[in-house]
């Protein structure tokens, strides 16, 4: 009895110790994020000067718009392709060498350095097409980086669904496609949104892949809405410097600009607020959709 009691106390002690270690590790990373975000935001606030948010060469308004627009373009391309690829792998692909090769290719693609993707994009989307740097080429480069995450997230989300989702729908007379579209994918929306959060955050902060594709210049005329014009904000075939690229330029080549340090600090602040804000909003929507799905299931 005493031996069992001492063993129980020892196991409980180890359990409490490991629980404390895990809480400590989690708290450390949360604290690290808070300190990093606070430092960047404080540096940005103290660097604000009149005109920093303007849509001129002395402001970051154009770069802010380019960042949002480029991520939007990349999501339009990557989300449908990634969801379709993940759905195929989870619901239609038969186990075999072809499926294994596809899975291996996705894993290899997810580990590619962004600079390699940027050089590939420069070769294919710029040199081979004969075009200059443009936003669409940048969006395609970000899409290449985003596809593995969305595909894997969709595949894993579909694979994790209970079997009765499929059997119940098919038993009621639905086809495989109707089951996928009306039952399975809606149930996976919260997890798919999580994947979209990750790729959007990467798109906001991407620099190396865009250096060779979207370019480092931005000349916009906000009075010009002719989409074929190179100065139209909505023209996808114009160069477009994003905030992350602007930070790099201001820190390396911005010595001619008297506010280069301030612009880099404010750009960093805006960028991290964008990433955190988008993540919080997407998490909120994901949780609401998850609650809605659980309520409908009851």
Regions found by a protein language model. Name each.
Residues 52-58, 210-271:
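Interhelical loop and adjacent transmembrane-helix boundary motif
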Residues 93, 155-159, 170, 197, ...:
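C-terminal transmembrane helix and the adjacent membrane-cytosol boundary/short C-terminal tail
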Residues 3-24, 40-76, 95, 249-261:
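Periplasmic/extracellular loop-to-transmembrane helix junction in inner-membrane transport proteins
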Residues 154, 176-216:
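Transmembrane alpha-helices
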Residues 15, 81, 93-103, 162, ...:
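Amphipathic cytosolic juxtamembrane alpha-helices at the membrane-cytosol interface
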Residues 107-143:
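Generic hydrophobic transmembrane alpha-helix motif, especially the helices
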Residues 74-106, 127, 282-291:
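Transmembrane-helix boundary motif in ABC transporter permease subunits
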Residues 65, 69-77, 81, 85, ...:
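Hydrophobic alpha-helical transmembrane segments of multipass integral membrane proteins
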């Amino acid at each position: 009895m005493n031996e069992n009691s001492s063993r129980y106390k020892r196991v409980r002690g180890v359990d409490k110790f490991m629980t404390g270690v895990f809480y400590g590790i989690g708290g450390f990373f949360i604290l690290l994020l808070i300190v990093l975000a606070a430092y960047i935001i404080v540096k940005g606030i103290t660097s604000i000067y009149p005109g920093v948010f303007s849509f001129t060469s002395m402001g970051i308004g154009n770069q802010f718009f380019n960042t949002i627009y480029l991520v939007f373009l990349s999501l339009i391309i990557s989300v449908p392709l990634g969801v379709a690829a993940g759905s195929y792998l989870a619901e239609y692909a038969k186990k075999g060498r072809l499926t294994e090769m596809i899975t291996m290719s996705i894993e290899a693609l997810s580990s590619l350095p962004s600079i390699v993707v940027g050089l590939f994009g420069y070769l294919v989307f710029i040199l081979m097409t004969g075009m200059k740097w443009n936003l669409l080429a940048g969006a395609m480069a970000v899409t290449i980086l985003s596809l593995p995450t969305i595909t894997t997230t969709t595949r894993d989300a579909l694979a994790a669904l209970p079997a009765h989702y499929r059997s119940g729908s098919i038993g009621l007379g639905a086809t495989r496609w109707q089951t996928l579209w009306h039952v399975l994918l809606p149930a996976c929306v919260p997890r798919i949104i999580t994947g979209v959060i990750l790729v959007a955050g990467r798109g906001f902060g991407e620099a190396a892949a865009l250096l060779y594709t979207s370019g480092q210049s931005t000349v916009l005329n906000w009075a010009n809405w002719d989409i074929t014009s190179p100065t139209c904000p909505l023209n996808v075939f114009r160069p477009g410097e994003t905030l992350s690229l602007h930070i790099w330029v201001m820190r390396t080549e911005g010595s001619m600009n008297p506010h280069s340090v301030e612009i880099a600090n404010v750009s960093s602040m805006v960028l991290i607020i964008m990433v955190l804000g988008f993540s919080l909003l997407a998490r909120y929507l994901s949780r609401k959709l998850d609650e809605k799905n659980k309520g409908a299931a009851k």
